[in-house]
Regions:
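Sec-dependent bacterial lipoprotein signal peptides
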Residues: 1-22
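Acidic/polar, low-complexity intrinsically disordered N-terminal segments immediately downstream
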Residues: 19-116, 126, 281-306
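Intrinsic-disorder/low-complexity loop/linker signature
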Residues: 77, 150, 230-233
Length: 306
């Protein structure tokens, strides 16, 4: 028994000595942040990215490739690489197609600095830190491609922006040539997209003050059968909706919108019209006005700044 105790004590002292000689231990599995610029880099782009993060609490990207690392060689002796890119996936619902985005990049520092100046002057003043995207991808052009079979993609449309959970991409090409009204419209559309994405991710409790007016009707058919789109919109507004149900770009008559469609339409209404304008335009539809006020409170609580 005494021998056993001595062996245990000796092992314990050995472990203490070994740990003491190793110094402070650090976790070996810390994941590298590939969104962040190298803080020791001296090139102008890296300095711009670091300064932006310090000021604005979001990462800044000019390329959707986060890392491109060699893995080794294949059996033919050719190099293999691991590529990680920014994934701005299109939000998948029952009425959207899987899609991807193809980007063209800004090529000069003047373009990149101009893009940063634009978002700092026009977008960030409306977004508190908690509402800002994790990262901004500022590029020249965005093209959206969709697929029917999940394998082959076909061109769908050019986009001025794309909003994802980890990144918001903005097409900044030609921005300096836009009129003041066009620049304002671009700003408004981006803010609307960011808020629509943010609101769609909120809990039922956060959205309860809004969805309580329409949750029983989402995605259901009306007992009435409107013959025209105008008749359909009267039916929608009477029930508190400002948008019909859409499949792609096509409205369905007599079918109430989904929850996501209802949220998105009212976020846009709140960001584009004042309370006085809404009360005038929807004077005959009191539920619409109540939902407008409820949504306005929600986005203010999320950090939107008027």
């Amino acid at each position: 028994m005494k021998i056993d105790k001595l062996v245990i004590l000796s092992c314990f002292l050995f472990i203490l000595t070994a740990c003491g000689n190793e110094g402070t231990l650090s976790p070996s599995n810390i994941k590298e942040n590939y969104y962040a610029a190298d803080s020791t880099a001296t090139d102008l782009e890296s300095q711009l990215k670091c300064a932006f993060y310090k000021r604005d609490s979001s990462y800044l990207l000019f390329n959707d490739t986060l890392r491109y690392e060699p893995l080794g060689k294949d059996t033919n002796g050719d190099m293999l690489y691991y590529t990680e890119t920014v994934d701005i996936g299109y939000v998948m619902t029952s009425n959207t197609m899987p899609s991807k985005y193809i980007y063209q990049y800004l090529t000069t520092m003047n373009e990149k600095q101009g893009a940063v100046d634009f978002i700092e002057a026009n977008l960030l003043p409306h977004l508190s830190v908690k509402l800002r995207p994790f990262s901004w991808l500022l590029i020249n052009h965005i093209a959206k491609y969709i697929t029917d079979d999940g394998v082959s993609y076909s061109y769908d449309s050019d986009k001025s922006y794309a909003v994802g959970d980890r990144c918001t991409a903005l097409a900044m090409g030609g921005l300096s040539n836009l009129s003041d009204s066009a620049r304002a419209a671009f700003t408004q559309s981006v803010l609307t997209g960011i808020l629509q994405n943010k609101v769609s991710k909120q809990t039922s409790e956060t959205l309860q003050s809004f969805v309580k007016y329409g949750s029983a009707l989402y995605g259901t058919s009306s007992s009435e059968s409107p013959a025209t789109e105008d008749e359909n919109m009267v039916l929608m507004k009477t029930s508190g909706f400002i948008s019909p149900y859409y499949w792609g770009d096509y409205p369905y008559l007599g079918l109430y919108p989904s929850k996501d469609q209802d949220l998105a339409s009212f976020v846009e209404l709140v960001l584009t019209q004042t309370a006085d304008e809404v009360e005038s335009a929807y004077a005959d539809y009191p539920i619409v006005i109540k939902k407008y006020n409820a949504m306005k409170k929600i986005i203010i609580n999320l950090g939107y700044i008027y």
